[in-house]
């Protein structure tokens, strides 16, 4: 076993990784140097996550090797890689909320005294690790009492406690506030300056250009190009290299004829709303719902879908009042939801693409005697896969192995299998790269053109303005304004979201 100590470089030498029916990585070669934050970018499914899993010891390369300062590394497990000085900070943090901060940092290496855990030493060591990161919160308290941003610091402290010299970050800012993001960037820069080798995966281009010194671009499991200096690299060139084509207008908005009222809400009240909410969306219309964290957007979709019980108000579908006491009631009425956290609330990761596609369609295809029509399910899943261009090795592949963009397509395909007339999309492109985003937008427009009523919740303001016919803005659980398409201005929407009034238009 090689213990990595102050390495000068990490090199991926002709790395390939094959799964049954899929070449996830093909002949990947590049070098990440000490004193540089090295970005990994590509569309979802380009191979970034597979490469990190190879680096972490979760996957063994089919071909090729990892080299540090001229010496080949061999891992038999993720624990093996960590012991050799390699740590991966994943988007889904590998922590235990019920344990203390200190216990999470030193889990597996707890100091003992007299046959039991030496709590005093444990907390002192944890406090010192947090101090290195500029944090001073109490390590003896349960982790669940702290914010996601502080959880990130705990994960980094955990890596440093094991003397990690190579640290990779996989979409670390997806759940962080702007202040927490800036704090994280400060820590990452300090780690770089301290001699660590840093790899950084993100789909947010503004982060890449703000934080990173070098970049490697992937496409379809292959290495496209590495820039050791990003000075002359533009956003447009990066997108072109990622997707293999120019994307001039990622939204490609197009108007369409609208029908009668598709979804109408009158004076809806419930959890997360501070004032009654009313809205009316026509058939074929795309209504964007914008607001900052805590605005009540997600809470509103959950009330409409029956995931939270409304305290007052009335919902109408095609002008007819309906009673929604549960998601089952909503689905029967033709209301569907793609939730904000698809991994927690929308997919069953260990089940196949076929099974996830048909979860909500099964009540419509039971044979006489209560038997499931498996042929119908196979045919339906294949039909949705083709229609939505889902990239998967087979319909039997576990959905948890797919990229975020392809998971989102499967969720959309699930609802296309039902008698859907209304779809609620909560952060539909979060964690999805620019190429897959354009495909999701195209699917949204196709739904609207079929007469489906669409509500899109997004914290990405350019996205909301790019695809919506109208935009409704919320702040602290209340609607603060509505904009028609000819009124769309970022300043106006932000003013409504932050101040609760349209000062930008004054």
UniProtKB/Swiss-Prot annotation:
- Primary localisation category: membrane
Q: Where in the cell is it found?
A: Cell inner membrane
Reactions performed catalytically: L-arabinose(out) + ATP + H2O = L-arabinose(in) + ADP + phosphate + H(+)
Q: Which GO terms describe its molecular function?
A: ABC-type L-arabinose transporter activity; ATP binding; ATP hydrolysis activity
Q: How does it sit in the membrane?
A: Peripheral membrane protein
Q: Where is the ABC transporter domain?
A: 10-245, 253-501
Cross-referenced NCBIfam families, in alphabetical order? PRK11288.1
Q: What is this protein called?
A: Arabinose import ATP-binding protein AraG
Species: Vibrio parahaemolyticus serotype O3:K6 (strain RIMD 2210633)
Gene this protein is translated from:
araG
């Amino acid at each position: 076993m090689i213990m990595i100590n102050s390495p000068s470089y990490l090199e991926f030498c002709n790395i390939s990784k094959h799964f049954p029916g899929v070449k996830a990585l093909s002949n990947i070669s590049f070098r990440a140097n000490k004193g540089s934050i090295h970005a990994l970018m590509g569309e979802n499914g380009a191979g970034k996550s597979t490469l990190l899993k190879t680096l972490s010891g979760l996957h063994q390369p089919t071909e090729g090797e990892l080299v540090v300062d001229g010496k080949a590394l061999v891992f038999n497990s993720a624990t093996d890689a960590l012991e050799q000085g390699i740590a991966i900070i994943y988007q889904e943090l590998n922590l235990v909320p019920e344990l203390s901060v200190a216990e999470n940092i030193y889990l597996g290496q707890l100091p003992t005294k007299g046959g039991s855990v030496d709590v005093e030493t444990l907390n002192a060591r944890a406090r010192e690790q947090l101090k290195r990161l500029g944090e001073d919160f109490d390590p003896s308290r349960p982790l669940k009492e702290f914010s996601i941003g502080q959880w990130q610091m705990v994960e980094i402290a955990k890596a440093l406690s094991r003397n990690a010299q190579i640290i990779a970050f996989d979409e670390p800012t997806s759940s962080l506030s702007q202040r927490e993001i800036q704090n994280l960037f400060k820590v990452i820069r300090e780690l770089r300056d301290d001699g660590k080798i840093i790899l950084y995966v993100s789909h947010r281009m503004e982060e890449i250009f703000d934080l990173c010194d070098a970049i490697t671009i992937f496409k379809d499991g292959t290495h496209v190009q590495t820039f050791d200096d990003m000075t002359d690299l533009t956003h447009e060139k990066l997108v072109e290299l990622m997707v293999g084509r120019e994307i001039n207008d990622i939204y490609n908005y197009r108007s369409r004829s609208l029908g009668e009222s598709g979804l109408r809400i009158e004076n809806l009240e419930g959890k997360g709303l501070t004032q009654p909410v009313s809205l009316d969306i026509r058939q074929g219309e795309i209504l964007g719902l914008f607001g900052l964290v805590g605005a009540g957007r997600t809470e509103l979709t959950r009330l409409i879908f029956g995931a939270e019980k409304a305290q007052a108000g009335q919902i109408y579908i095609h002008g007819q009042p309906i009673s929604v006491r549960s998601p089952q009631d909503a689905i029967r009425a033709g209301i569907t939801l793609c939730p904000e956290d698809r991994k927690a609330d929308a997919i069953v990761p260990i089940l196949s693409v076929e099974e996830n596609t048909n979860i909500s369609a099964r009540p419509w295809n039971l044979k006489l005697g209560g038997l499931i029509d498996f042929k119908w399910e196979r045919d339906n899943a294949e039909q949705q896969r083709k229609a939505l261009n889902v990239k998967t090795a087979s319909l039997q592949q576990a959905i948890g192995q797919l990229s975020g963009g392809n998971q989102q397509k499967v969720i959309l395909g699930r609802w296309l299998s039902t008698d859907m007339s209304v779809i609620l999309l909560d952060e539909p492109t979060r964690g999805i790269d620019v190429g897959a985003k354009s495909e999701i937008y195209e699917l949204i427009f196709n739904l609207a053109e079929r007469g489906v009523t669409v509500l899109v919740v997004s914290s990405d303001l350019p996205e909301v303005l790019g695809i919506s016919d109208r935009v409704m803005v919320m702040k602290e659980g209340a609607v603060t304004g509505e904009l028609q398409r000819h009124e769309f201005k970022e300043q106006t929407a932000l003013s409504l979201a932050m101040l609760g009034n349209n000062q930008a238009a004054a």
